[in-house]
A protein has these predicted regions:
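Terminal low-complexity tails and localization/encapsulation signals of metabolic enzymes
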Residues: 1-51, 84, 88, 125, ...
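Residue-level signal for inorganic ion chemistry
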Residues: 46, 78, 82, 104, ...
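Conserved C-terminal structural/oligomerization subdomain of aldehyde/semialdehyde dehydrogenase
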Residues: 47-51, 203, 227, 264, ...
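Glycine-rich loop-to-alpha-helix module at the N-terminal edge of alpha/beta enzyme cores
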Residues: 47-137
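Structural signal for hydrophobic packing residues in well-ordered secondary-structure cores
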Residues: 71, 75, 90-97, 101, ...
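Rossmann-like NAD(P) dinucleotide-binding subdomain of oxidoreductase/dehydrogenase enzymes
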Residues: 136-273, 398
Length: 476
């Protein structure tokens, strides 16, 4: 049985996007020193949403100086006073959540259901969570009176713009640091709206500074001599470059990089439940997730049954307008990312894997890619080794738990994994054997601000979230 869904669009009118935005430095919006701007577009239709200032080295220096000046008073505030600001920010995010969700879907391309029901609740939850820690740092296990580091330079990606901002800013402020944050070039708007929330909350000037720009802006921020802490989420290639820049300095560094997660399904797993977990694991946020379950490892005895059910489920996925509440898969974030996804999918075919995608009518304008499944994949295929960062699933098989572990660990990355089985002892054994920072049991892509997140190998180092996330912003 198939169902037809009438469009159920969220109103774009709930968010007011200005024609242009400056940099947020020392509590005020200002033009870039060089006067340069760039356009941010909607990936769903390539419409220009706004013009945004391009920060130069001079702007980076101004922002870092503002953060350094604010640090003296901010770090001296009692934790309970800092907590009041964080609680206020969290409540303002909740009050403006509909506006922010629409903005995120417009600028990023993700479905409104995801930005509304997943991203925004987690954003607020992170500020609430770390507000609770601000006056309890002496009980976090890092000494009786842990001290902040100073100025934190933070660079975030385009896949979860506002959520990654919360992951970084909330613990930094709770610990008494000040922040200079650079959002991704293709998704700057939610960070600029957050700057306005900081003003609404009465946050002291200079405590949070937002610099928009391209990779050169991020490089200037990372290299600035008065930055004490660098936190980066993004590609492994850029992460390695940042590590080289920071090497030999006294900067503290956290890197959360790429992944090639294995979603492992054993023969005793409930098929329908596993299929939902597989779909959520790879097609959530168009596969633009560092911990996406982009490799499906299925036990040979249930391969046919599982793939048949998975294809049926994929055929029901709706691709289209991110603001339509019925949409399951939105737009790819940029033309560059779409080109990379296409190139790796083509490589999968040319290397001998069998490609399948459901019948899917894609919009003419914008950047789109149908949910895609590859079978007959081997460990040597590029689609089994390289991060695609799109809605592409590579299927491999295994016979024994030992073989599943060997295949799952045979990747440069070590960020996440999922295990589907009814045997608790098997789950515990697998979790101990898998070289992954996060292992989900009979679920996937579940996040909580109280739970640490991070990986091994080329997936980076350090942890964000939970009590462990405080350590990155304390002098311990």
């Amino acid at each position: 049985m198939s169902f037809e869904y009438a469009p159920a669009p969220e109103s774009r009118a709930v968010v007011d996007i200005a024609p242009s935005y400056g940099l947020f430095i020392d509590g005020e919006f200002a033009d870039a020193a060089g006067g340069k701007v760039f356009k941010t577009v909607s990936p769903a239709n390539e419409e220009v949403l706004s013009e945004v200032a391009q920060a130069s080295a001079e702007d980076v220096d101004r922002a870092v100086k503002a953060a350094r000046k604010a640090f003296e008073k901010w770090s001296a505030l009692p934790g309970a006073e800092r907590a009041k600001y964080l609680f206020r920010i969290a409540r303002l995010i909740q009050e403006r959540s509909r506006e922010l969700a629409v903005l995120e879907s417009l600028d990023n391309g993700k479905p409104i259901r995801e930005s509304r029901d997943s991203d925004l609740p987690l954003v607020a939850a992170h500020f609430f969570y770390y507000a609770g820690w601000a006056d309890k740092l002496g009980h976090a296990g890092y000494g009786a009176d842990p001290k902040p580091l100073g100025v934190a330079g933070q660079v975030i990606p385009w896949n979860f713009p506002l959520l990654m901002l919360a992951w970084k800013i909330a613990p930094a402020l709770a610990c008494g640091n000040t922040v200079v944050l650079k959002p991704a070039e293709t998704t700057p708007l939610s960070a600029l709206f957050f700057a306005d929330i900081c003003r609404q909350a009465g946050l002291p000037k200079g405590v949070v500074n937002i610099l928009t720009g391209d990779g050169s802006t991020g490089a200037e921020l990372v290299a600035h001599p008065d930055v004490n802490k660098v936190a980066f989420t993004g590609s492994t290639e850029v992460g390695k470059a940042i590590a080289r820049t920071v090497a030999g300095t006294d900067k503290k560094l956290t890197l959360e990089l790429g992944g090639k997660a294995a979603n492992i399904v054993f023969d005793d797993a409930p098929v329908d439940q596993a299929v939902e977990g597989i779909v959520n694991g790879i097609f959530f946020n168009q596969g633009h997730v560092c911990c996406a379950g982009s490799r499906l490892l299925v036990q040979e005895s249930v391969q046919d049954e599982l793939l048949e059910a998975l294809k049926r489920r994929m055929s029901t996925l709706r691709v289209g307008d991110p603001l339509d509440k019925n949409t399951d898969i939105g737009a790819i974030n940029s033309a560059e990312q779409l080109a990379r996804i296409k190139a790796l999918a083509d490589a999968g075919e040319s290397e001998g894997a069998e490609r399948w995608a459901p019948a899917c009518e894609l919009p003419d304008a914008g950047y789109w890619f149908a949910p895609t499944l590859f079978t007959g994949v081997t460990q040597a295929h590029r689609i089994a080794q390289e991060e695609i960062f799109g809605p592409v699933l590579s299927v491999l098989t295994f016979r024994t738990p030992e073989e599943a572990v060997a295949k799952a660990n045979n990747t440069p990355y070590g960020l996440s994994a999922g295990v589907w089985t009814e045997k608790g002892s098997r789950i515990l054994w697998m979790a101990n054997q898998l070289r992954a920072g996060i292992v989900w049991s009979n679920t996937f892509n579940k996040f909580d601000p109280a739970s640490p997140f991070g990986g091994y190998k080329e997936s980076g180092f350090g942890r964000e979230g939970g009590r462990h996330g405080l350590e990155a912003y304390l002098d311990v």
